[in-house]
């Protein structure tokens, strides 16, 4: 199982803002945001935040957008603003760094990190962006780069499909593309691992770890995950949500091993 080569992105579809979360990537990511909002608070001095947003999505005009977090399992609105002529603004005091969700009604649009500084948010039918503060810059730079790598992998897969449809020998196709696919897969794994390791001590480390793990069909240990955990400091390993994932993953691995042993015994 290639842990980090799974397609994850934050690119909206044209009608998404009207009816649903903006991307297949948003669902697992927002699920992670819910967890992180509940427990990943980093103490800081009380400082002011400023969110300035622009939207080219006409259906948003007149709608109210919310910054929401979880408090004891319930949604709490941290701030809100009405979109007027494609613009919205929120300002307030922040006492801790926390992941929040920009929402319209009950639908999550995109994750944001609420921290001291001025954050610029762009909403369109093509892309979602958040820049202007250190952690948001880092998060969306990661998302952009990860999407670029995923697009390259998709193109290789499309090329493989085209060659098959053209009637070329499958073994020849595999030989032609295997090296390139393996190299790109390793690049993706390395990029994600290095990003998490570089952010072990802040909200991005466990946030991105859970984000990529949430794309897996179920919690499981892989060589990539083992490598991240093996070099992680105690603060990362002791994060409640990382610990919960690892406990479930190791339990699943034991179940899988038991199933394999039972199947082998039955055959013998």
Language model feature labels by segment:
Residues 137-141, 191, 196-203:
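Soluble oligomerization/assembly scaffold segments of membrane-associated complexes
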Residues 197-200, 204-268:
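Charged, long alpha-helical assembly modules
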Residues 176, 180, 187, 191, ...:
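Charge-rich, solvent-exposed alpha-helical interaction surfaces
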Residues 45-189:
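A non-transmembrane, solvent-exposed segment enriched in polar/low-complexity residues
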Residues 174-175, 189-193, 207-214:
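Short, local alpha-helical segments
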